[in-house]
Amino acid sequence: MPEAIQIYVCADNCMRGVVLTAAEMNAAERFSFVIVEEENLLNGNLEDVTIEGVTDVLKKLEKKPKAVLLFTVCLHHFLGCDLELVYGELEARFPEIVFVRCYMDPIMQKHGATPDQKLRKAIYDPLTAGYIDKKTVTLVGSDFVLDKNSDIKRLLKNKGYTLREIPACKNWEEYQCLGAGEFFISCYPPAKYGAEMLAERLNRKHLYLPGSFDYREIKEELRKLLQELQTGQEQENISDIKTISEELEAFCKREIIFCEAAAGHAKAIIGDTSIVLDYLYHPRPLGLAGFLLKHGFHVTTVYLDSVSPEEKNVFDWLKIHHPDLELCATIQAKMRVLPRHTEEKVLAIGQKAAWFSGSLSLIHI
C-alpha cells in the first residue's frame, strides 16, 4: 500500500521475527513497533498501551503517512482488548490518517478466515465506491504486478481495457483509483475472500480466475473474462457468442502450442533429474506436479500441509496414475529431524522444497 506504514503492537519475543522480515524486505523505514511488557498484561491497560504507543510513533515521524496498517496480536484476543475503542481514539487523534485493521494472530488460523485472507481484505478496506472508470479493471490481492505477457493482461489490452493493481500504485491517489474499476478480478486463492467482500461492498462484479495448470480450466476462465468484457460494451459493439468462441479457440490454440514447446525444451534440459516442489511456490502444487508428470518429468515429492478443494480432481488423478508420489506435511514435528540430503541430484521448486531436500538447485520466484 503506497504512502503507508506498518505498526506492530506485540511482545518482544514475537517482534524478533517481524523485525527480521522487515529488514529482509528492505522495508525497515516503513516499519515501527510498540513493545507490550508483562506489567501491561497484569495491569489490564493494553488499550492504553496500544493507543499511546501508536500515538508516540506517529508524533515522532517527520512526515505523516496516508495510512497505518496497525497489527494487533494474540494478546489482544486473549485479554479481550476493546479494539473498537483503540481504533476510535486513534482516528479521533489523527483524522487525516486511515487506520487499517490488521491482525497477526496465528492462533486463529484454524477458525474462519486465515490471517493471510484477513490482511488481503483489510488493505482494500479504505477504497470507496465513488465513480466507475470505464474501460478499467482492478486486480485484487496479488503480491506482484501481473506479467505483461499474462493471458489476462493481453486480453484486456486487446479490448482496450486498463488493468489496475496495488503493487503498481506509486502514491495514495493511484491506490484510491483501484475502487473505480468496472469489475474486480482475483487470481490468488487467499485473495478471493477479500475480493468478494470488496465487490459486495462497492456493488461490483467479481471474477475469480485462479492460476491453473489445466488447459480446459484456463480456457473456461478466459471465456468468463471475455463475456464480462462483452457486457461492458455498447450494444452496437457486442460480438455474438460464436465470435467470442472463435476468438478464444484461436488464442488458446496458439498459447497451448507455445506452452508445450516450452515444456519440451525444459524437459530436454532437466531430463530425468528428480524434482521436489512445495506449496509456497504456487498455490496449486498438485496441479503443477500433475502437469510435470504428464510431460515426462520425474517428480518425487510435494511438500504441502493440506489439499485445497480446488485440487481434488488432480489429487484423485495422482492417486490413480502416480501412487508413488510422496506428499509431505511441512508442519509435522518429525520434519525437524528427518535427513535433509539425497544421494542424487535434486531440483527443488520452492524454498521449502529446497530446505527439506537439501537441494542446492532451486527454482524460486
Where do the protein language model's features map onto the residues?
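An N-terminal assembly and electron-transfer interface module characteristic of large anaerobic redox
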Residues: 1-365
